[in-house]
């Protein structure tokens, strides 16, 4: 496999999660150990996915436990949501877009030219989505007192072999 996930790729996504959640939701997250997702799917209560294209093509997904997204949105909007609804789904799409956008901005400083698609949001307790990519999927887990969230990133490059 020719594609390696070095800190130049990983750090923009780490920084984006920490920055966006800190700024928008006054929320601190604890980084877990990044790993390659060999199951090639994401499982959780709500997921936002976004396509990234340009110098490299890829995807980013943000998967959250229900208590985590409820706290984020309640902090952002000064509300008291108790279940996932349309407003929560909209917020997941916006968070996905903001995290991908911040990471893209940092990757642009490294000489990449990237743009994003419109996010798609998948809702359902314990849902599982399959990533449609032949490239390795890097999972970056974070924890909060309410539960976990995972950002998954996969970039295709010339010569990338199916995992």
Indicate residue ranges for each PLM-predicted region:
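N-terminal auxiliary interaction/assembly segments of multi-subunit proteins
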Residues: 1-163
């Amino acid at each position: 496999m020719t594609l390696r996930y070095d800190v130049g790729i990983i750090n923009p996504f780490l920084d984006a999660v920490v920055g966006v959640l800190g700024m928008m939701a006054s929320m601190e997250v604890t980084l877990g150990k990044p790993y390659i997702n060999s199951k090639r799917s994401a499982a959780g209560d709500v997921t936002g996915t976004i396509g990234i294209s340009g110098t490299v093509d890829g995807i980013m997904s943000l998967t959250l436990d229900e208590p985590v997204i409820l706290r984020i949105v309640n902090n952002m909007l000064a509300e008291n949501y108790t279940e996932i609804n349309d407003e929560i789904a909209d917020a997941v799409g916006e968070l996905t877009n903001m995290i991908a956008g911040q990471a893209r901005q940092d990757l642009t400083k490294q000489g990449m030219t990237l743009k994003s698609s419109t996010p798609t949001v998948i809702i359902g307790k314990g849902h599982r989505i399959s990533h449609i990519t032949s490239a390795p999927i890097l999972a970056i887990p974070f924890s909060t007192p309410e539960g976990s969230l995972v950002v998954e990133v996969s970039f295709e490059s010339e010569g990338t072999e199916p995992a």
